[in-house]
Design a protein with these regions (language model features):
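N-terminal interaction modules that seed assembly of large macromolecular complexes
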Residues: 9-76
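Ampiphathic alpha-helical segments that act as solvent-exposed interaction surfaces
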Residues: 102-137
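Short glycine-rich, low-complexity/disordered patches
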Residues: 36-44, 77-96, 129-148
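Alpha-helix boundary/N-cap detector
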Residues: 15, 19, 59, 63, ...
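Structured domain cores in non-transmembrane regions
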Residues: 55-112
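Ordered hydrophobic segments in well-structured contexts
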Residues: 36, 47-49, 87-89, 96-104, ...
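Glycine-rich, aromatic-bearing surface loops/beta-hairpins
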Residues: 128-186
Length: 186
């Protein structure tokens, strides 16, 4: 059940879309460096994919992974948040590299997503492929962060599985599709 999100003058912003759809859209709008976001209801995993404009060397990936593990360890220790499963992998394909971060939704927080995003941006900066969105104002950023936090909480509490959804950006638009390759009828 979606909660209202605090908005202007004590009003509440309520989202009518499915929880996972709202989460995917807000993540893609809030973090323009994200190429795609997938929610897998079976495993309750969120897959965050970033694209680099050139292939990634194994050593550079291992260094990024080491820094990320260290940063997350410090984050969990200082914040007191429960440390969940986070798997990071990469794939070189032609002239690009794809970095996938899989996170367990049951323990994931908005702050953790922000940290992961910031670590990717700090490490790969100009190499990240990003659709430059209009700069969101501080208030809009806060609204999307509140939506993300609320949708994560809703997914943690939900006992009904949603559909597997994938969202990505194309020509300035955010698109979300039902994606279940195991049940395609050919």
């Amino acid at each position: 059940m979606s909660k209202g999100i605090p908005w202007q003058d004590g009003e509440s912003l309520t989202l009518n879309n499915s929880t996972s759809t709202s989460l995917i859209v807000s993540l893609l709008v809030r973090y323009p460096e994200l190429a795609s976001v997938t929610f897998d209801p079976e495993s309750k995993d969120l897959h965050l994919v970033f694209v680099l404009s050139q292939p990634l060397e194994k050593e550079a990936f291992e260094e990024f992974q080491r820094k990320t593990d260290l940063s997350l360890g410090i984050f969990f220790e200082l914040s007191g948040h429960e440390q969940g499963k986070i798997d990071i992998s990469y794939l070189n394909h032609e002239k690009n590299a794809f970095i996938e971060i899989r996170c367990d939704v049951q323990t994931l927080s908005q702050e953790e997503i922000a940290l992961l995003h910031d670590l990717v941006v700090a490490e790969f900066g100009e190499r990240l492929v990003s659709e430059q969105e209009d700069n969101l104002g501080e208030e809009e950023l806060e609204v999307h962060e509140a939506i993300i936090e609320n949708m994560l909480e809703d997914l943690k509490e939900s006992s009904r599985p949603d559909k597997t959804l994938i969202g990505f950006r194309e020509e300035g638009r955010v698109l979300v599709f039902n994606s279940n390759p195991w049940h395609n009828k050919n």
